[in-house]
């Protein structure tokens, strides 16, 4: 383990086109094999598609989609005695944002549309309307936390 302490958190640089840090985080989540230009093209085309289909600002729609996907609770495994309990805990804002972006991109990749741009466009639109696999994942996570509420006193 390093002796200097934890690495400092670096501020997220806003992306050059929309001027929103959340867009650059989405680009970094889409990024594969260091091909940032390709990732930027996918995200920008997807956001242009969102604006065209929705008729609203793409960044506003993306933020609404992330609000619908962002979890408030999750479960963590905690070993007490000989048994392991799923303990519900509140999710910190930074982790909630990261999970929302991760789920959005993961479920966009698993969609059936032909191009990644179309998949991401439709997943963002579905999530902003409260539909889609990413929103379902959040609901499942909340349901799991709700059903394990009895073990909340094991929180640490």
UniProtKB/Swiss-Prot annotation:
GO terms for biological process: translation. GO terms for molecular function: rRNA binding; structural constituent of ribosome; tRNA binding. Keywords: Ribonucleoprotein, Ribosomal protein, RNA-binding, rRNA-binding, tRNA-binding. One of its GO terms (cellular component) is small ribosomal subunit. InterPro entries: Ribosomal_uS7, Ribosomal_uS7_bac/org-type, Ribosomal_uS7_dom, Ribosomal_uS7_dom_sf. CDD domains: uS7_Bacteria (cd14869). It holds the Pfam family Ribosomal_S7. One of the primary rRNA binding proteins, it binds directly to 16S rRNA where it nucleates assembly of the head domain of the 30S subunit. Is located at the subunit interface close to the decoding center, probably blocks exit of the E-site tRNA. Belongs to the universal ribosomal protein uS7 family. Part of the 30S ribosomal subunit. Contacts proteins S9 and S11. This is Small ribosomal subunit protein uS7.
């Amino acid at each position: 383990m390093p002796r200097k302490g934890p690495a400092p958190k670096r501020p997220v640089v806003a992306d050059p086109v929309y001027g929103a840090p959340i867009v650059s985080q989405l680009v970094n989540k889409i990024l594969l094999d260091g091909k940032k230009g390709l990732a930027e093209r996918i995200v920008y085309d997807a956001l242009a598609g969102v604006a065209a289909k929705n008729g609203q600002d793409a960044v506003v729609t993306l933020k609404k989609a992330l609000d619908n996907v962002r979890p408030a609770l999750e479960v963590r495994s905690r070993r007490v005695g000989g048994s392991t309990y799923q303990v519900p805990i509140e999710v910190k804002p930074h982790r909630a944002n990261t999970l929302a972006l991760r789920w959005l991109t993961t479920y966009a990749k698993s969609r059936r549309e032909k191009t990644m741009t179309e998949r991401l466009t439709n997943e963002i639109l579905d999530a902003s309307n409260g539909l889609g696999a990413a929103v379902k994942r959040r609901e499942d996570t909340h349901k799991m936390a709700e059903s394990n509420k009895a073990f909340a006193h094991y929180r640490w």
